[in-house]
């Protein structure tokens, strides 16, 4: 079975550092990243454009992050246009692949991306928004992607903000406490 780079880094380096820093009695108390949620909210376009948009979004996320994901769709009709919400849940190996690509390749290339503050950590969960995730890619539905805000939620197993902060800072996420 293929082990990705971030998972081996967690097992060999981060787990050991957290164990020595906080003196856990049991190794199962050491926090880890449970899952990653990506949401795209309030798309308002005609129904044919929405499904083409969804198809291209799935293709792009598969090509960029090499993921297979489960998406939940919520459609509400508003006269001629529709309100469309998309939620992508990444678990186990997929969230490590996504975080590895996000931290090492895409966050440094996003224009005007600031360091995340401690206010984005709530009960051990990190929430942040990215306005222009697909600025690097140019294709015919670029106008649809430029207007959208991607909300990324990283859930950890700890409820303590300081433990979550130390875990995420060891993953080299740009976060300031």
Task: State where each predicted segment sits.
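Ribosome-associated RNA-binding proteins
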Residues: 1-177
């Amino acid at each position: 079975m293929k082990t990705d780079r971030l998972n081996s880094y967690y097992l060999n380096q981060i787990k050991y550092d957290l164990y020595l820093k906080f003196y856990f009695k049991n190794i199962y108390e050491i926090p880890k990243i449970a899952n990653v949620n990506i949401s795209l909210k309030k798309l308002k376009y005609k129904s044919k454009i929405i499904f083409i948009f969804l198809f291209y979004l799935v293709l792009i996320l598969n090509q960029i992050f090499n993921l297979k994901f489960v998406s939940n769709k919520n459609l509400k009709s508003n006269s001629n246009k529709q309100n469309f919400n998309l939620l992508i849940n990444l678990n186990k190996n997929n969230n490590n692949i996504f975080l590895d690509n996000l931290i090492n390749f895409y966050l440094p290339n996003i224009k005007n991306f600031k360091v995340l503050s401690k206010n984005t950590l709530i009960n051990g969960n990190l929430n942040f928004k990215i306005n222009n995730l697909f600025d690097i890619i140019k294709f015919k539905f670029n106008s649809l992607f430029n207007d959208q805000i991607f909300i990324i939620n990283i859930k950890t197993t700890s409820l303590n903000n300081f433990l979550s902060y130390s875990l995420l800072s060891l993953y080299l996420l740009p976060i300031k406490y």
